[in-house]
Regions:
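Secretory targeting and sorting signals
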Residues: 1-19
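Acidic, Gly/Ser/Thr-rich repeat motifs that build Ca2+-stabilized beta-propeller blades
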Residues: 15-149, 187-189, 194-199, 207, ...
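Beta-propeller blade signature
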Residues: 105-111, 156-168, 212-214
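Acidic/polar, solvent-exposed loop segments in beta-strand-rich repeat domains
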Residues: 148-158
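Loop-centered beta-sheet repeat module
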Residues: 157-166, 173-198
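Active-site rim elements
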Residues: 174-176, 221-225, 238-240
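Predominantly extracellular beta-rich ligand-binding scaffolds that present long acidic/polar faces
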Residues: 197, 204, 213
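Flexible internal linker/loop segments at domain or repeat junctions
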Residues: 216-230
Length: 298
């Protein structure tokens, strides 16, 4: 998962002198008080679901009397409640590290009783991934990091460093590989034109990438992030504009597609640490580590 990447933080102190356009006015609305909300998704009705990394509680806005669910998560390092997604039928899916063997699993948690969709690999202290998204064709996509075993990225039998497609109506013993070659693809989103863009974490001082992740092979159309960010979330504002949340920078940054490359285009808001999602009326909801706030996308 792309939270608190220890390796990504190495060398990040050199970014303080980067020149950049000033941030916009502070986010002007608080939606929910959720500490370390690492999983965000929007329901078909326009509501927001936010999952707490360490408690496994899933809260909603507009608020419910009780949490939608409280998952039994294993914690420590980058473990916990990792991802949420809601499809057009109103089914809600959660990815998390379960207690006991600490494997990454995906459940359908609503409506009705929870049902296991996929039992994945054992988690690691870092680079688990676990973000979920619904593809335009309705398929469920999960990103899995290298799990601190980068040598397995090249192994087609291992989930390490891959974006996987999970069926929601059948067994997922061998999920289809959407793309491979990632360090930790926790931050990804589909743009309105159907393309999947990934803001990939990278270890140490290696540059972080913003690249296509839906072409069936290695990352394509690769750009580099302007500074060491440790991306923890990405939201498509349009087909040519993205908002990227940075755990290290604690900013919500704008990137625009220009002549085939993504280029930094200023800071939308400060305080973003754990994720971002586009909500209704042209706004973004982002997690500060203390609460969920909103800001205008433009």
């Amino acid at each position: 998962m792309a939270l608190a990447l220890v390796t990504a933080a190495v060398g990040a102190s050199g970014c303080g002198g980067d020149s950049q356009p000033p941030a916009r006015a502070p986010a002007d609305s608080r939606l929910l008080d959720v500490a370390r909300a690492s999983a965000l998704t929007v329901t078909p009705g326009g509501g927001l679901l936010a999952g707490d990394l360490e408690t496994g509680a899933i809260l909603s806005s507009p608020p419910r009397a009780t949490p939608l669910a409280r998952l039994k998560v294993a914690t420590g390092g980058q473990r916990g409640l990792l991802g949420l997604a809601a499809d057009r039928r109103g089914h809600v899916y959660a990815a998390y590290t379960r207690r006991g063997d600490r494997r990454i699993v995906v459940d359908r948690i609503a409506p009705g009783a929870a049902r296991r969709i996929w039992t994945g690999p054992r988690s690691a202290d870092l680079a688990n991934g676990g973000h979920l998204a619904i593809a335009p064709d309705g398929r469920l996509v999960i990103g899995i990091g290298d799990l601190q075993e980068p040598a397995l990225i090249a192994d087609p039998r291992a989930p390490n460093g891959k974006l996987l497609v999970l069926r929601t109506d059948a067994s997922n013993r061998r999920p289809a590989i959407l793309s491979s070659g990632w360090n930790n693809p926790f931050a990804f989103d589909f743009t309105p034109d159907g393309r999947l863009w990934v803001a990939d974490n990278s270890p140490g001082r290696r540059p972080e990438r913003l690249a296509r992740g839906d072409l069936g092979g290695a990352p394509e159309d690769v750009s580099e992030l302007m500074r060491k960010t440790a991306p923890s979330g990405i939201a498509a504002i349009s087909s040519t504009e993205l908002a990227i949340c940075g755990f290290v920078t604690e900013t919500l940054d704008r990137y625009r597609l220009n002549q085939g490359r993504w280029r930094f285009a200023g800071t939308i808001a400060r305080g973003c640490r754990y994720g971002v999602v586009r909500i209704s009326r042209g706004r973004l909801a982002f997690s500060t580590g203390r609460d969920i706030r909103t800001v205008a996308a433009r």
